[in-house]
């Protein structure tokens, strides 16, 4: 999925429901919106996941900071819980992908809390996980 198309509503409105059922939106992409090297980066990540030793050095602004969920939330392509519930689902879309399985359990927890836990329960879930030592922070 190309997250830069997330907000291309004029394109999405023309799809049939069968086509909409095949669309998957990448919600929390942190990649620089103006990146022209995304294909090479994505391929490198895929090859690393396969055990290959390929390297790709991102030249995007602030790439040295790594992934930050707060940064992703400011990305023009970011899809919030509110967007999912009030924009995309009423349009007939139901497939949403959360990036970052390999970023570490603390970040994955934040994604799951944000996207899958009601705000009033987020602190309770976070405390239970921290107090139970289930989270590998390092």
Regions found by a protein language model. Name each.
Residues 1-138:
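Active-site pocket-lining/capping segments in soluble small-molecule metabolic enzymes
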């Amino acid at each position: 999925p190309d997250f830069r198309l997330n907000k291309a509503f004029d394109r999405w409105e023309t799809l049939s429901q069968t086509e909409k059922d095949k669309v998957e939106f990448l919600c929390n992409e942190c990649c620089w919106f103006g990146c022209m090297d995304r294909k090479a980066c994505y391929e490198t990540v895929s090859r690393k996941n396969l055990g290959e030793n390929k390297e790709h050095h991102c030249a995007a602004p602030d790439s040295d900071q790594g992934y930050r969920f707060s940064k992703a939330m400011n990305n023009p392509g970011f899809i919030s819980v509110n967007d999912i519930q009030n924009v995309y689902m009423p349009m007939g879309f139901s497939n949403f992908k959360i990036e970052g399985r390999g970023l570490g359990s603390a970040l994955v927890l934040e994604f799951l809390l944000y996207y899958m836990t009601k705000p009033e329960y987020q602190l309770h879930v976070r405390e239970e996980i921290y107090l139970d030592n289930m989270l590998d922070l390092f």
